[in-house]
Amino acid sequence: MPPRKSFWSGPKAGIIGVSIAVGLAALSWAGNNLGGASGSYPEATHKVTLPKTLLDGGYTLAQDLSEQGESALAGTSEADIRDAKAVVGQYTSVDEDGAGVLVLSGMYGRIKNPDSVRSSMLKGAAEADGATVAVPPKDIEVAGSDVTVSCEVVTTASAGGEKTPFAMCAWADDNTGVSVAEVTPKSVAQSPESIDLDAAAANALKVRDEIRKPIA
């Protein structure tokens, strides 16, 4: 059976649903589980967008879920973030052999403590129903970039009890905080420990370059 059919015919709906839930849980934690940093709020200079394609056209936007993201951010503490706006999208691969799913869940605003936002997003991922952190978060420095990306491996349990592993990465800066979860046939077939988090971090930075734009 071709990889695309085997991947999409069974776990597709569950994988998409749980990966979206994981992204929304991460977003909720980013806005509501921070400690309250000292100092002033940065100037708002950048925003997060939802382009029609990602990763050089490899993924196409299937759903704009930003309204659900706004609900996840409801009650966001202004102790660390001001003027927060949610941006959430689900993308699917345009490659017939790839059959990937990518969920982008983030926000933009004025972020006082980006490091806390980044770590909170990954902590929040484990709060989604059916999700477990199989490989704990680690900070990854990608060559050629001064942006710290944190990545972990999350597993989700299907109705049949099978676990689906995927990498989830997050970054945050003075204006943007985003998590990126990508599920592919390759990741589904791997053990959590064998998923390449360095490659996932590099991909997350490519996504960052494509979605983070100056405020006009």
Where are these regions (language model features)?
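Short, hydrophobic alpha-helical membrane anchors of single-pass surface/secreted proteins
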Residues: 10-18
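A small/polar (G/S/T-enriched), proline-flanked helix-loop surface module common
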Residues: 50-167, 175
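Extracellularly exposed regions in secreted/surface proteins, prominently low-complexity, repeat-rich
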Residues: 143-216
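Core hydrophobic alpha-helical transmembrane segments of single-pass membrane proteins
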Residues: 17-27
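C-terminal region of N-terminal signal peptides and the immediate post-cleavage residues
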Residues: 8, 26-47
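Membrane-topology and secretion signals of cell-surface/extracellular proteins
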Residues: 43, 65, 206-209
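Intrinsically disordered, low-complexity Pro/Gly-rich regions
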Residues: 1-10
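Alpha-helix capping and helix-coil boundary motifs
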Residues: 9, 113-121, 195-199
